[in-house]
């Protein structure tokens, strides 16, 4: 399939006062290069020569009210254990079309593993309000693609953390990608016939597609040390889907808003370390009406820094850069991130964290991101034309806060990006290099994501090449097909 959704909204950074979106054909970045379908047969990619699975349309999901009232399951029932006939109608066609589909006992074990070991890794701070448990996991009972994606990441994560490899995760991933491609093909066919996007993507479809794409992106990070490129396909496809739906009124469900903001976190942090010409085009930003969300102001400012740094690089490449052209000073950056830090701490009140280690560690996480962002800004935007005392101060606090975390294991999902930045700031400090290496090894092992070992290898390469900057090395890696995504 060579197009996604046929038309894509171009939202020009989604800022107030942007020019109206333009509509035009869009190459599917997530499911085009990897798969192309001709009469239902994959002609390239993982599924070459295999036909598209034909899954019956799932039954209507329960009302949104029921979804909102869902709670974190103490024990996830298998489809056969659940008396709800809707669930069986989703499982039955999967069993018929997917050889080796897990038996009820295995499904129960995999869903419970997702509930207990993976859902908490997907959010800033795990709590009873975790939407991945409360809303996404129950949705899998009605959506076969999402069910396959969740079973895939759960099985792969279990395999990585227990050392028992199996073939099911990759096959489930491929089948889920195939079914998303099938849905995209159906929609684009209708668009070609003259139908508008809003009439072809209903809210339920938008939600399961976006949830599946995000789940599959995480799956790729568990599978190999070089999973960033594959994960990036899913991220770009999710970005395209969200931007396309911005032209409709089909993106207003609470779960879609949650998933959209999850994508914004992933998208913005990813863009800090990849450098392709389209890397910062139509990035998903925190929704303006969700400015009270944790880290939303921080992420918006961080992305501005990324965009400004790419503009500087382009001007320098053409010999037209003047330091006075930078839109902010280092003092402005410090003030802006300090303001964002305060906003994050205020927004965190909704979590109602008890006064224990989790609360103290969250405050440290905010500090960690604050100083990592300052160091990132000093390097990529100001090229360290900043007082050394400022750089050294943020570096010192960053390492101190990382070392002060009381319950590191519960914080690991938040650490890949700031630990990466810490790693770029210790090229001449062997003790700090050992600390960063241990942190990344712990992240990879405890989270069950093999990809982070690849990030560690990048940092070790950087430490041994003292004459290059981390951005230069990352560009070199990317040119050779190895994207660096420290998320």
Regions found by a protein language model. Give the residues of each.
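Cytosolic regulatory protein-protein interaction regions
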Residues: 96-99, 128, 135, 139, ...
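C-terminal region signature
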Residues: 416, 425, 429-487
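Hydrophobic/aromatic-rich effector regions of fungal transcription factors
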Residues: 114, 133-139, 149-162, 172-227, ...
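Charge-rich, intrinsically disordered regulatory segments
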Residues: 1-129, 169-170, 186-190, 461-486
